[in-house]
Amino acid sequence: MVLWRISRHRDLGGIGGLKAAGRWHYVGHRIVYLAETPASALLEVCDHTSSNDVPPKFTLLKIEGPDLDTPSVSTHALPDNWRTQLDVTRDLGTDWLEKNESVLLRVPSAIVPETMNCLFNWAHRQAAEFRIVEAIAYPFDARFKK
């Protein structure tokens, strides 16, 4: 299994989740958001970056792990307003983290719900089977944030 992440940090420790809440978790929980393609990783970063904060370059992390039967959250299982009601997705993701039943959870992107992202549970026993195998530095294309 190959997953992708754009980050300033080359680790899968989920420290950022301790400091800030995200779409699928409340603050105080270690979690890493991953994408199934490099393009969807870039889309998520662009959505969360203002045009004034566009970095001159970014690092794309290629993450490999075992092929797993990964549980998924379907948009059909979510209320119609899930994209605007953060408590719905945060409750679901935080509950998943606390149960610690799987290392990954596939979730729909709030930007393009037909695209799936993966939540990575660093505390799960299988987390050690995932590793960053490549870090690729790219210049950031300014056309994204015009």
Per-range role (PLM):
Residues 26-48, 118-123:
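Extended catalytic/binding region for NAD+/ADP-ribose chemistry, centered on the ART fold
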Residues 19-21, 47-49:
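Short secondary-structure capping/turn segments at boundaries of alpha-helices and beta-strands
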